[in-house]
Every structure is written in C-alpha cells, then in structure tokens.
Amino acid sequence: IPVLAPQFIAQYAPAVNEQDVGIFVSQSGETKDVLNALERAQAAGMTCFSMANVIGSTLTKQTTAWLPLTCGYEISVPATKTFTNQVITFLNLANLLGGGDGRALEGLPDLMEETLAMCEPQVRVLAEEINAWNDFYCLGYGATLPMALEGALKLKEITYAHCEGMLS
C-alpha cells in the first residue's frame, strides 16, 4: 500500500505487526515524517527496509537493509534523478519478487532515449502554449495517480505556478 508517512502513522501503524514488511523511501534518508513512521512501524514489530540516496543516513542505519539509489548528490529541489531512480529500483524489485531474472529493465535506457527524442518537439510546443498559464491540474487514475501527483509537484517546484495532482 503506497502511503504518505503521516498517513501511515494515523491510519496504518496501529494495525501493523511482525508479519508485515515496509519499505521506507526518502531521498536524503533524513526526512522527519519518514523517520517518525519508521519508528512507529518498528515499535509494532514490522520488518523495515529503506530506499535512500545517502549512504550512512539515519534511515539506512535504522532499517534491516536498504536499497541504495546511487544517483549522486541532488542539487535541485525537484529531485528528478532521485525520483527516477526510485521508480526504476521499485520496478527492478517488483520484477525480481515476481520471479523475473532481473534483466527486464535492460532495454530501459534505450527506451528512455527514444521517448525523449520522440516527445521533445511536442513538449516544446506545449510548453510554449501554456507558458503564461497560472493554474495546472494533473489528473491520474489507478497506476497513473502517483505520476500525476509527482508531475504536479515537479511543476510547482520548478515553475512556482499553482498545480494540483488529483484522482480523475
């Protein structure tokens, strides 16, 4: 169940136990809300793993094991490198847990390059067209909802425009 750390504390922490597993995700490994959720989960006996970009962070030290993102120091607020690596790491983990051989993502770099090249002209046209707008809504449903939420956050952080991600 993907959940925001404060929501986990309020809604799910009272119900977890030693038969549950949690993966706690933080770019820095120092996000207070995530560390608070981790503390509650561990107090309930949950097995806790983490995914972080900073080796030796509080989060990585306090979990049973951690998945390193190794995408380098994040200098921009939107944390695009970290987010991209988090998605790829989760895809790889899901593939392996589902019985895959770990090679499912081998073609991903080429696919990403093709997608960027194919979309670049349309993205430039769209950016030019909506550049003066002040309000944006990114809508998603099901598996695309997290992308809509993250897309809205990226637009807010980079453009300072009003943008909301929401369920369609």
What are these model-derived regions, one by one?
Residues 65-168:
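Active-site phosphate/pyrophosphate-binding segments
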